Swiss-Prot record:
Any GO BP annotation: L-histidine catabolic process to glutamate and formate
Enzyme Commission number, as recorded: 4.2.1.49
Coarse class of the protein's main subcellular location: cytoplasm
Family: Belongs to the urocanase family.
Lyase among keywords: yes
Record InterPro entries: Urocanase (IPR055351), Urocanase-like (IPR023637), Urocanase_C (IPR035401), Urocanase_central_sf (IPR038364), Urocanase_CS (IPR023636), Urocanase_N (IPR035400), Urocanase_Rossmann-like (IPR035085), Urocanase_sf (IPR036190)
Catalytic activity: 4-imidazolone-5-propanoate = trans-urocanate + H2O
Protein name: Urocanate hydratase
Keyword annotations of the record: Cytoplasm, Histidine metabolism, Lyase, NAD
Required co-factors: NAD(+)
Co-factor note (free text): Binds 1 NAD(+) per subunit.
GO molecular function, one term: urocanate hydratase activity
Keyword Mitochondrion recorded: no
Length: 555
C-alpha cells in the first residue's frame, strides 16, 4: 500500500478527446484527477485533498485501479468504490449511476477515530471527508459562497447590515478554512486568519484567497487597524497557533468584531497543532506517538474554546463553523462549550428550508469561457435576484479557478433543474465547448445528518436522525445521477455525521435532459421534505408552493 509518492503529479485532461468510452465515464475520471491537481489538493502526493486526511483514493494502487476501471467502463455498467478502493463492476442500465461510492462508513458502536485509525493503518479504510472521496471538490471556492452568506447574515443581525470597518478573527487556512478570508472581504469585513503551516498560507496567497501575510501579531493587528479605519477590507494571514493568538488578544484587551474558527479540529491527531509544539514535532509525532498528539491537541482545543467563550461573554458575535471544536472541548470538561451557536441554526437554516444550498458546476473543457457563459445563463434564468447577481459578479472578479474552471452558486428547489437543463442545451448546441458536471457539497439541505453542524438544534429534536441522507442517496441513485456517494464523518469527524453526495453530467443528450430534470428536482426536494418534517413553516410553505407530495408530513 503506497500512500505517499512524490513523483506523482495528477491533472485532469481538458478538451474533447476522451480517455474513457463516453462522457458519462470520462467525467468521473476527470473529476477524480482534478481533486488531486496540485493547484487543488492540499497534499496531493499523499492523495489528501482537504480536511486533515480527506483523500480521493485509498492509496496509489487503488487510484490506478479506479482510473483503469473508469477507462474501460461501459454505459450500462456501474463501478463500486469502497472507501477509496474499486471493488466491483456490475451490469446495470444506462440511467443508473456509473459510479457508486461508500466512504468511511462504520457501524455506529465502532464509529470512533480509534477504530477508524486502526483500519486506516491496515489499509482497510479511507477518510473521504465530503467532496474529497466523492470527486467533486473545486478548491476553496466550494464553500466561499456559504461562508459569504454566513458573514453577510452576521452583519445583518449584529451590525445593522454592514460590516464596513469591522474585522473577523478565525483560524485555519486549509482547503475549507482558506475560503474565509476572501468571503469576509467580499462581505465587506477585514479578516485576520491564523494558520500554523506556511505552505497553506502560500497556497491561499497564490490562489487569491488571501491578500497578505505576516509572522508578527503586532504587524497583523496594525494592518487590520489600518484597513478598518479606511474601511477597505483586507485579509491577513498570521503564521502561528490560533489558541496562542486568542490568549494574547485577551491579554491585550483587543476584541474582534466577529469570531469563528475553521481549523481541522474534527481530527485531533491530524488536524490541530498542540500549543507549544512546532509543526515539525507535530508531523513526526502524528506517526510515532498519535495518542500523545491527541491528548495535547485536545487540551489546546479546550483552551481555544475557553477564549472563544470569553469573547462571546464580552459581546463578540461568535459562531462555530462546523469543525466540531466545541464537542472536543466539551469532552475535555468545558461544560458550556456549546454556549455559542453553530453557523447553520444561527444563520443558514432558512435557506435550507427552501432547498437552497451549494449548487456547483465544473467545465470539463477546461476553458474559463464556459463558466462565463454559464454565469450569464444563471442571470438570464433568475433575473430578479439581485443578491445572486451580485455574488456572480464578485465571483467572476475575485475567485481564481483551481484546476478545472468551476462555479459555486447557492440556488434551490425550482431553479436547480432549470439551470441544469439550460446547461445541457448549451452543450448540445455547441455554445459550451464540452460537457459540464453539476454537483454540490454534502453540506446541503437534505443530504446530511450532523448534530453539531447542519442538523444542530432541529426544531423537533431530530438532530441525529440519519435516515434522511440515506434516503437522499437512494433517491439520487434511482433518479439517475451519474455518481452517488454515501460518507460518514465528514466535517466533524468519526461518529458525528452521515452524508450523501451526487454529481450529474450534462453531456448534451436528450437522455441527459430526463436524468437532469429528475435529479436536480428530487435532490433539493429532499431538503424541503426533511425540514418540513421537522416542523419548519418556511419548508412547509415551500413544499406546498412547489407541489411536493409529502404524505405523513403535509396534511
Amino acid at each position: 500500500m503506497t500512500r505517499h509518492d512524490s513523483t506523482r503529479v495528477i491533472r485532469a485532461a481538458t478538451g474533447t478527446t476522451l480517455t474513457a468510452k463516453s462522457w458519462l465515464t470520462e467525467a468521473p475520471l476527470r473529476m477524480l484527477m482534478n481533486n488531486l491537481d496540485p493547484d487543488v489538493a492540499e497534499r496531493p502526493q499523499e492523495l489528501v485533498v482537504y480536511g486533515g486526511i480527506g483523500r480521493a483514493a485509498r492509496d496509489w494502487e487503488s487510484f490506478d485501479a479506479i482510473v483503469a476501471a473508469l477507462t474501460r467502463l461501459d454505459d450500462d455498467q456501474t463501478l463500486l468504490v469502497q472507501s477509496g478502493k474499486p471493488v466491483g463492476v456490475f451490469r446495470t442500465h444506462a440511467d443508473a449511476p456509473r459510479v457508486l461510492i461508500a466512504n468511511s462508513n462504520l457501524v455506529p458502536r465502532w464509529a470512533t477515530w480509534d477504530h477508524f485509525n486502526e483500519l486506516d493503518k491496515k489499509g482497510l479504510a479511507m477518510y473521504g471527508q465530503m467532496t474529497a472521496g466523492s470527486w467533486i471538490y473545486i478548491g476553496a471556492q466550494g464553500i466561499v459562497q456559504g461562508t459569504y452568506e454566513t458573514f453577510v447574515e452576521m452583519g445583518r443581525q449584529h451590525y445593522g447590515g454592514s460590516l464596513a470597518g469591522k474585522w473577523l478573527f478565525t483560524g485555519g487556512l486549509g482547503g475549507m478554512g482558506g475560503a474565509q478570508p476572501l468571503a469576509a472581504v467580499m462581505a465587506g469585513a477585514s479578516c485576520l486568519a491564523v494558520e500554523c503551516r506556511r505552505s497553506s498560507i502560500d497556497m491561499r496567497l497564490r490562489t487569491g484567497y488571501l491578500d497578505t501575510w505576516t509572522d508578527s501579531l503586532d504587524e497583523a493587528l496594525r494592518l487590520i487597524e489600518e484597513s478598518c479605519t479606511a474601511k477597505r477590507p483586507l485579509s491577513v494571514g498570521l503564521l502561528g497557533n490560533v489558541a496562542d493568538v486568542l490568549d494574547e488578544l485577551l491579554l491585550r484587551g483587543i476584541k474582534p468584531d466577529l469570531l469563528t474558527d475553521q481549523t481541522s479540529a474534527h481530527d485531533p491527531v491530524n488536524g490541530y497543532l498542540p500549543q507549544g509544539w512546532s509543526v515539525e514535532e507535530w508531523d513526526a509525532k502524528r506517526v510515532s506517538a498519535p495518542k500523545d498528539v491527541e491528548a495535547a491537541a485536545r487540551e489546546a482545543m479546550a483552551n481555544h474554546i475557553r477564549a472563544m467563550l470569553t469573547f462571546h461573554a464580552l459581546g463578540v458575535p461568535t459562531v462555530d463553523y462546523g469543525n466540531n471544536l466545541r464537542q472536543m472541548a466539551l469532552e475535555e470538561g468545558i461544560d458550556n462549550a456549546f454556549d455559542f451557536p453553530g453557523f447553520v441554526p444561527a444563520y443558514i437554516r432558512p435557506l435550507f428550508c427552501r432547498g437552497i444550498g451549494p449548487f456547483r458546476w465544473v467545465a470539463l473543457s477546461g476553458d474559463p469561457e464556459d463558466i462565463a457563459k454559464t454565469d450569464a445563463k444563471v442571470k438570464e434564468l433568475i433575473p430578479d435576484d439581485a443578491h445572486l447577481h451580485r455574488w456572480l459578479d464578485m465571483a467572476a472578479e475575485k475567485i481564481a479557478f483551481q484546476g478545472l474552471p468551476a462555479r459555486i452558486c447557492w440556488v434551490g428547489l425550482g431553479d436547480r433543474h432549470r439551470l441544469g437543463l439550460a446547461f445541457n442545451a448549451m452543450v448540445r448546441s455547441g455554445e459550451l465547448k464540452a460537457p459540464v458536471v453539476i454537483g454540490r457539497d454534502h453540506l446541503d439541505s437534505g443530504s446530511v445528518a450532523s448534530p453539531n453542524r447542519e442538523t444542530e438544534a432541529m426544531a423537533d429534536g431530530s438532530d441525529a436522525v440519519s435516515d434522511w441522507p440515506l434516503l437522499n442517496a437512494l433517491l439520487n441513485t434511482a433518479s439517475g445521477a451519474t455518481w452517488v456517494s454515501l460518507h460518514h464523518g465528514g466535517g466533524v469527524g468519526m461518529g458525528f455525521s452521515q452524508h450523501a453526495g451526487m454529481v450529474i453530467v450534462c453531456d448534451g443528450s436528450e437522455a441527459a435532459d430526463k436524468r437532469i430534470e429528475r435529479v436536480l428536482w428530487n435532490d433539493p426536494a429532499t431538503g424541503v421534505m426533511r425540514h418540513a418534517d421537522a416542523g419548519y413553516a418556511i419548508a412547509v410553505e415551500c413544499a406546498k408552493d412547489q407541489g411536493l407530495d409529502l404524505p405523513g408530513i403535509l396534511s
